[in-house]
């Protein structure tokens, strides 16, 4: 499996950046997950969206799904042109917010709500979802192609579910939305240090994403070192092998 990062920032992007948007590829399958600000043009340039097998949304905050609207518009046009034949499958948590309803109501999408402990299969990929610690319903997941396992923590502060998601994975993508100086247990995100410590605890290689654009990259790298984990800072428009 391979994971491509098209947006690594949150809760908003810097100039020429994008918020959370990723694509997971296996031998048979292309699954996008998260589709934040700037996602459509970047993802569609590398992986035509009409050929994607599914889109997973961890939760309904704008920095994770804001480009779903233009994605829906594009798919409707592609249907009219014959470039796409079926609605794009979206897997997401149950949420009745106005934002979620706006996305779920678009005719371009076929939406399936999933929850804690649910499992789905998309061609050769098997996913298991876990509820994580965020102010709105939010899911992380583990996915395997039968050989390797990739873990995504979603947006989350510390919680037991992250241990279940990350333990034994070959590669993890973790929310390092805060530097430790700005973090406490009531915040909506992990610190970079906390991500690094979590990776060390489980002996897992990790990519730190959901980075605040106001933070200095050097500070982020220093905090990874303090945590002691085998971690790298996410780079946009880069592909990593699981």
Regions found by a protein language model. Name each.
Residues 71-89, 137, 144, 184-207, ...:
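P-loop/Walker A phosphate-binding loop and immediately adjacent motor/lid segment at beta-alpha junctions
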Residues 1-46, 113-164, 236-242:
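Core dinuclear metal-dependent hydrolase active-site scaffold
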Residues 159-239:
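Cap/insert and terminal regions of metallo-dependent hydrolase folds
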């Amino acid at each position: 499996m391979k994971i491509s990062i098209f947006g690594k920032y949150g809760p908003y992007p810097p100039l020429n950046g994008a918020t959370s948007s990723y694509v997971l590829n296996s031998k048979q399958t292309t699954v996008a997950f998260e589709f934040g600000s700037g996602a459509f043009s970047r993802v569609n340039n590398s992986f035509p969206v009409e050929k994607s097998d599914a889109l997973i949304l961890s939760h309904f905050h704008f920095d994770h799904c804001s480009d779903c609207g233009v994605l829906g518009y594009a798919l409707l046009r592609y249907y009219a042109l014959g470039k796409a034949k079926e609605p794009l499958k979206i897997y997401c948590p149950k949420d009745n917010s106005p934002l979620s309803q706006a996305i779920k109501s678009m005719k371009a999408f076929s939406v399936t709500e999933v929850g804690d402990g649910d499992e789905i299969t998309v061609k050769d990929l098997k996913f298991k979802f876990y509820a994580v610690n965020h102010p709105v319903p939010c899911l992380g997941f583990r996915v395997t192609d039968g050989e390797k396992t990739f873990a995504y923590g979603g947006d989350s502060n510390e919680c037991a579910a992250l241990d279940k998601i990350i333990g034994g994975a070959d590669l993890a993508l973790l929310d390092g939305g805060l530097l430790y100086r700005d973090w406490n247990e009531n915040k909506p995100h992990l610190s970079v240090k906390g991500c690094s410590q979590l990776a060390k605890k489980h002996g897992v290689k990790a990519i730190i994403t959901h980075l605040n654009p106001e933070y200095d990259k050097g500070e982020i790298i220093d905090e990874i070192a303090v945590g002691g984990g085998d971690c790298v800072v996410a780079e946009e428009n880069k592909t990593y092998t699981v």
